[in-house]
Amino acid sequence: MRKFYTSESVSEGHPDKLADFISDSLLDEFLRQEPESRVAVETLVTTGMAVVAGEVRARSAHVDVQKVVREAVQKVGYTRANYGFDAEYSAVLVSIHEQSPEIGGTVDRSEEWRQMTPQERARPENTFSEVGAGDQGLMFGYATDETPELMPLPISLAHRLTRRLAELRKSGALPYLRPDAKAQVTVVRNGEPHEATETHVDTIVISTQHSEDVSQEQIEADMLEHVVRAVIPHELLTPETKFFINPSGRFVIGGPHGDTGLTGRKIIVDTYGGAVPHGGGAFSGKDPTKVDRSAAYYARYIAKNIVAAGLARRALVEVAYAIGRAHPVSLRVDTYGTGTLSDERLADLVRAHFDARPQAIIAELDLQRPIYAQTAAYGHFGRPEFPWEQTNKAEALRRAAEELKQEA
């Protein structure tokens, strides 16, 4: 039976992604000045205006918010007033206030930590029990062997397309391109990803903002030659593959002038393209004490190491927290029947080799540093520059699994 899988990606100039980039650029500047900053910053961008609001706790950081916002807009490419939104002339409104002391206090001293005696706090196993989760919630991490980066194929291909559009725009190779763009890829298989013997691209959709002086015919020809065929493996394309290039027609008005953008509205683009569940929490603008972000990264780290160890072809890791508590309230592993051990035994292995307390995650992945602006576009996963993409625990997991099999 044929099964269709679709994912989309949006460019760094898409208004929602611009908002994410601004929020993460501000986060990075706070962390650069004060690594223990607590930050939750949201951005709205619209015609001629950016609005930044949120909660911050930083004792020594002095961030020029206006400057950071304008530099972020400049980097993305909104540099002309006739775009309806630009780095120099658009207004920047700021409403940032202090983090709630009630939230800050429960994160600083977790419920478990408050109940310990000084002697208990000094024990090695409690080193990372001081910091509590910044909120309740559930987070998912996923890995699959269908691509070298252990990501679902449709989202991987969609990100390639939008990255390529940005490269061609910034290099001047296609001078009519403008910052706002989207791509969507539909992959068809004759079964589940781990079972399929045939895979090809059924449909590609590209919508790209452009200048007024280019024809639809020129855009279509360039997208096929310089974008699609440059980044999509030829063996995945067939004579039946369908292409829709700017199917709405002209796309001159774009970016925040065409659509208002908000931080956190592209959570499926940011993760696995709809291949697996999502807990609902966005990433951008949040410091790593917010488990919406750090625990989702850690769940990916766990899932990727499971697959890299050869213990499953697909792995979904779900972790959940209560605000103010250090230890997760639940952890679940689902390998979709591809595991070399039962999911329950794999979950036991995960608990033995990974520490999902927020403070432990921050320490292990070195998250209190300015690395977040680069996550804002083209996905947070499947990119080797990020620490949660390491597979440094795969060998230990493999050995532990072998020992369990021998004991059975």
Curated annotation (Swiss-Prot):
Gene3D superfamilies reported in the protein's UniProt record: 3.30.300.10
GO MF entries: ATP binding; magnesium ion binding; methionine adenosyltransferase activity
Known EC number: 2.5.1.6
Broadest EC class assigned to this enzyme: transferase
Binding site for K(+): E42
GO biological process, one term: one-carbon metabolic process
Cofactor (UniProt): Mg(2+); K(+)
GO cellular component term, pick one: cytoplasm
Annotated function: Catalyzes the formation of S-adenosylmethionine (AdoMet) from methionine and ATP. The overall synthetic reaction is composed of two sequential steps, AdoMet formation and the subsequent tripolyphosphate hydrolysis which occurs prior to release of AdoMet from the enzyme.
HAMAP family, per the entry: S_AdoMet_synth1
Name assigned to this protein: S-adenosylmethionine synthase
